[in-house]
Structure formats: C-alpha cells, structure tokens
Amino acid sequence: MRLGRDFYNRDTLTVAKELLGKVLVRKINGVTLKGKIVETEAYIGAIDKASHAYGGKRTNRTETLYADPGTVYVYIIYGMYHCLNLISEEKDVAGGVLIRGIEPLEGIEEMSKLRYKKSYEELSSYEKKNFSNGPSKLCMALGIDKGENGINTISSEEIYVEDDSLIKKDFPIVEAKRIGIDYAEEARDFLWRFYIKDNKFVSKK
C-alpha cells in the first residue's frame, strides 16, 4: 500500500524511523525498481544547523523543503552526486528525511545497468557491496537526479514509497550521529541517523 500524505505530515524524527522497512519504488525505462529503506537521517530546519533551511532560510535551492509532505527533494553534493530526501511535517515547516541506504528487492538488473553500466552477474564483490549503501549510490542505482526534485510521491507513478505487509517490521533500530556534518556545531551530535541493525546495505555502522 502506498504511503499517503498523513504518513509524512508528522514529526520528522518519527517519519525517519518509520520509513525503515518501507519500500522505495522507482519506475524508469519501463521497469519497476524497488528497494527496502534501511537507513535514514532526519533534518529539521528550524532548529538544525545541518539543515539547508536552518533558521527559516528560503532560497531557490531550498524551496522544495517547504513543500507539501511527501514531496521529493533532490540536491547535489560535491558538484556531481545526488541525494534523495522526502519532505515531512506540515507545508512551510521545512522538515526532511534523507534516504541513506536501500536493500534492492526488484529490478536489480536494471539497477546494475544504471549504477555500473553492466549486468549484475558481471559485478565484483566490491561493486555488489557498494551497490546502494549510501545516498548517492542509491540515487545512481535508481536513476534519480535533479529532474525528480519536486515530485509528489502521493500521486506520482515515477517515485513513491509503499508499505509491504510481507516485509518483517520487528527489526532493531540503531540511533546514531549523522554523517558528514561536522560543521553543524551542536547539531552534529544529534542522534538523528536511524538504520536497521546488521543490514549490509547500511552505509556506515
């Protein structure tokens, strides 16, 4: 069942935790790709110095952070890598959840072509290990870039998240510091990264 607006229109920390175990769906090139979300990070603009919208900052780049809950926010790091976020909280609040890792479930062959430009059976063990265990890696595997910024997952057929009743949900969740935000002063110590314990597609244990 597809997640609706009410799922995202809640406290960002709750959304970040409850996205774990949900299935990210991407339709591209006539193929459906699916991956179980195994790692997330929460960002809350009003109080979070790691957020692009800290202190209510609004720019052309960050405007999507203030969009309706369930909207896709894609930004670029290092001038070339993309990161996928899902907007939480009410419209104009600027909460978001970064998707940091997914476990491939369906369409793995197409994901492999998008990620490495070769079939999955041709991949080395190193390439398989690094298939989608990081925010930019999963964006490559799913063919996500700035063109997807602003998509509403509530109604879109290109990107959305669903709750698969067959997927086990009673997994232990680890709370940890977020990654790559040493500049964020006290916010760098917030335990706002969440991941499924012992899942091999988590970017960093």
From Swiss-Prot:
Source superkingdom: Bacteria
Species assigned in the record: Clostridium perfringens (strain ATCC 13124 / DSM 756 / JCM 1290 / NCIMB 6125 / NCTC 8237 / Type A)
Enzyme class, first EC level, given as a word: hydrolase
Protein name as it appears in the record: Putative 3-methyladenine DNA glycosylase
Annotated EC: 3.2.2.-
PANTHER family, alphabetized: DNA-3-METHYLADENINE GLYCOSYLASE
SUPFAM superfamilies attached to this UniProt entry: FMT C-terminal domain-like
GO molecular function: alkylbase DNA N-glycosylase activity; DNA binding
Disulfide bonds listed in the record: none
Family according to the record: Belongs to the DNA glycosylase MPG family.
GO biological process: one example: base-excision repair
Assigned keywords, A-Z: DNA damage, DNA repair, Hydrolase
